[in-house]
Amino acid sequence: TGSYTGPIVVQDAPKVIEKNEWDLPEDLEMTFDAQNIKTQVMGSKYTVSDAYTWQFQFLQYNENWRYAGDQLYIEIVNNLDETEEPVPGVYKISDSNEVGTARMGTYKRDTGVDGFGTGTYFKHYDEGTLRWAGAATDGEVEVTKNDDGTYTITFDFLDGQQEPKHFKGTWTGELTRPW
């Protein structure tokens, strides 16, 4: 027997990922077909240093204007001078905030009414109650500007669970700016 005082260094230990009640139980094919839907895009030169970010928001509501179904937030990073509209292309999730990537997401359930996220993340409501939510830690989004001025957004993201689940889908339509 003996004793040791000092640090213990552990290499290659598995990362402990907390299990949450709002984690997806299986892959989610997202749909955007609610009675009331708001699809918008907002730009910012303040989110990332020396870059311009575009956040796409897909928000769905029931007849009483309460959240319903799938809600999605995607944030891409463009050059600082690309402020007129989002630049079409394929954006891979990254935590680097480099131009040409999609921002990795965060999501905290204990903040705000139904939690709060940054970057790329989703929420799913069932009968007005938050059922599932999570942040994108991997995957990609393709942004296409169509000849008629509409956009097609095709995405396949993985959440940050121990056994990651996909949240994916496609949407085509007009994007509005809130201002």
Model-inferred region functions:
Residues 2-34, 76-80, 137-139, 156-179:
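Edge beta-strand at a domain terminus
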Residues 2, 50-52, 70, 149-151, ...:
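Residues at beta-strand starts and edge strands
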Residues 17-50, 55-57:
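Long, contiguous N-terminal structural blocks used for assembly/anchoring
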Residues 11, 17, 25-26, 32, ...:
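Intrinsic disorder/low-complexity signal
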Residues 143-151, 179:
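A short, structured loop/turn motif at beta-sheet edges
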Residues 65-67, 148, 162:
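Short, solvent-exposed loop/turn segments that connect beta-strands within catalytic domains
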Residues 7, 41-143:
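Surface-exposed helix/loop patches within compact recognition domains
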